[in-house]
Regions:
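Flexible, glycine/threonine- and acidic-rich loop/arm segments that mediate assembly and lattice contacts
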Residues: 1-40
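Sequence/fold signature of self-assembling virion shell proteins
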Residues: 59-98, 105-110, 116-171
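Helix N-cap / beta->alpha transition motif
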Residues: 7, 44, 113-116
Length: 171
């Protein structure tokens, strides 16, 4: 637990008000920082480390299902954020099934990225034309509204090339 104390001498010299205000702001800033770091921790450890109720890390290719199968919420081989990998993720999410193997028709909502990927995300999600080609092709990700809420930059993600799609699946 963080805190601060004011000396009796500071109180006697009437420095309490100026010191208290400065220290209180610093303490609030430290608390806000800690909350952000702890909040990002689940994504920073999504591929290794903390396991959950099914014995798997958050992003795994082998989440066990009741019917004996497994469900994957990540590609078999990690991939950088680009048009192909994002389209593949959108398609994979659309094919997710429930515990009984029934299609749940899930959709991506928002892309979460570290600051290093913000320009890539802008090109992928906000341009009219297809990225990296001189052809006059439409940007299918943008045109189809594949990621309707766009992207959010999380400054507390520690892996500069990790990216995550939030979906409409409730649990």
């Amino acid at each position: 637990a963080m805190g601060f104390s004011i000396t009796e001498e500071a109180i006697e010299d009437n420095l309490y008000d100026s010191l208290s205000s400065r220290y209180t702001k610093a303490l609030a800033r430290a608390m806000a920082y800690t909350k952000q770091v702890k909040g990002a921790d689940i994504l920073n450890n999504a591929f290794a480390g903390t396991t959950f109720g099914d014995g798997q890390v958050l992003c795994s290719t082998a989440h066990p299902l009741v019917n004996g199968g497994v469900n994957s919420n990540r590609p078999a081989v990690g991939s950088d954020l680009n048009e192909t990998s994002l389209e593949a993720a959108v398609i994979q999410i659309a094919g997710w099934t429930d515990e009984r193997g029934l299609l749940i028709a899930s959709k991506p909502k928002k892309l979460v990225i570290p600051p290093a990927l913000q320009f890539v995300a802008t090109r992928l999600l906000e341009t009219e034309g297809r990225v990296g080609t001189a052809d006059n092709d439409l940007n299918a990700l943008n045109n189809n509204g594949s990621v309707p809420q766009g992207y959010a930059v999380n400054h507390y993600l520690t892996d500069t090339d990790a990216w995550f799609l939030c979906t409409d699946v409730p649990n």
